[in-house]
């Protein structure tokens, strides 16, 4: 995926999923925490842009990753969240 001058790619290395970012001359590999138990590639749930900030939301079976990219300062924040199950109950 190519977005706002940033190339985004998911790869599996050493049994863990990584998000590879290529921002011009700089390349960054972000390991997706807790992804070693996930065999299928995480899917892009949403990609949003707010001013100069990119917000990526990835989903895989029981986990979500929220990745915030600040291209101007090349800072990246990655947060791993468990999926929430909604259970309906008859009353």
UniProtKB/Swiss-Prot annotation:
Record-annotated membrane-spanning stretches: none
BP-aspect Gene Ontology terms: viral process
Cystine pairs: none
Database matches in Pfam families: Bunya_NS-S (PF01104)
Superkingdom assignment: Viruses
Family label: Belongs to the orthobunyavirus NS-S protein family.
Protein name, as recorded: Non-structural protein NS-S
UniProt lineage: Viruses, Riboviria, Orthornavirae, Negarnaviricota, Polyploviricotina
